[in-house]
Amino acid sequence: MLFRSTLADQLAEARLDEDVKAVVLRVNSPGGSALASEVIWREMELLRQQKPVIVSMGDYAASGGYYISAPADYIFADKLTLTGSIGVFGVMFNLEKTLKNKVGITFDSAATSPAAGGMNSLRPLTANERKSIERSIDRVYTTFTNHVAEGRNIPINEVLNIAEGRVWSGTEALECGLVDQIGGINEAIGKAIELADIKEQHALYEFTAPMTPFEEWIDSMGLLYTKSWGLDYNIYAEPIREILSNNPIIMNNNGVQALVPGNMKINL
C-alpha cells in the first residue's frame, strides 16, 4: 500500500542528506492512491537529479508500485515479480438500495443547482458526474503512461501497447523494457555503488525499518474506523463483498486509484 506522507518524506530526507551518495528503493506494493503515487513520483524525480536511484522490486511492484519505480536510474526485478499493471480506476459506490433493503433507511434531498450534493453515494451518479469521473481517470492514466515513457525512455506508443492494466512477470517486464535486469536487493546495492562511483569504504543505512506487530495494528485502524461507521463488507452484494474483502486498500482510499486488479497467485 502506498502512503505519500511516509515514503515521500523519507525520499526527501535521503535527497537532502549529503552523506547519502545513492538510494536503493525496495518496492513491494500492488499500488494504492493515484495522488500518493504522484507525490512519491515527484520526490523520486527530485532525488534522481541529485544522486543515483535504484529500484529493487519484491513480489509486487504493480500499478502505483510501478508508477513510483519508473523514474529510477536502474530497475531490478525477480523473475516472478508481478509488475506493470499500468492503469487506473475509480470507485464510487451507490448505497441507496443497499441501505433501503438491508437497513430500511431511505433519503430525500433538495438541491439548489444540478451540481449541489455532487458525488453523493446515496443516489446514482448523474450523467455529468459520470463524465467528470471518467475525465479524471483519463487524465491520471495519461499522466501515468507519460511518466513511464519518460522514465524508461520508451516511445509513448510502445508504452500504450503494454499498458491498459496488463500485468507482467519480471522476466516479461525485462523483455518489455519495464525493468533493466533480473536480480535482487544485493545486485541493486551493487549497482548503486557502481553508479555513485563509491571507491572508499561505505555503510548501508535503512531509512524504513519493518513495522512491528503493534505498528501494523495501528496501520490497520483506518479500516477499523471505516467499519465502526457501519460500512462493513457484509452490507454489500456478494460480488462487491468479495472484491472488497480481498482488497481493503479500496475501502481506505478515496478517488482515483492506481492499483493492481484483484489478487493474483502463481502456481509452480
What do the predicted segments below correspond to?
Residues 96-195, 199:
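Charged, glycine-interspersed solvent-exposed loop segments at helix/strand-loop junctions
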Residues 27-31, 59, 180, 185, ...:
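A mature extracytoplasmic/lumenal domain signature
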Residues 39, 82-95, 116-125, 218-231:
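Short flexible/disordered coil segments
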